[in-house]
Amino acid sequence: MDSKNQIQKREIKFRGKAKDDGTWVHGDLTTGDTIHISASWYKDGECEWWGHECHEETIGQYTGMKDKNGKDIYEGDVLRYETDYDLLYFEVKWNKDTLMWEAISQVIVDEPLYYKNGFIKIIGNIHDNPELIERIAE
């Protein structure tokens, strides 16, 4: 088997809140004196580009996973995990020690996000919905 077919690729993308109008933008992360989310593409043989300066604290990376409704899960999202016997809320964080995306709550700490993948729903994020952080602490 061809080795390039054995490698599973994950889409690398980011989101952040634009400083100019407060909207969420998605694309590539570029850093320097300021932080931008940007995208580029070719049209009619010319390279076109857009970029938005973003609030640094709102930058979050795509986890490569989707919730039960098919929505992309990003760092900083707040998830609801519901089964017949559980109702829990989690914040999505990157653990640099285990090199894994984790669902963090007060009840279950440091559990790999993929353990709950089929039962989770995005209900907001820590930036637009700070009141959801209280649910995580319950």
PLM-predicted stretches and their roles:
Residues 1-138:
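Secondary-structure transition motif
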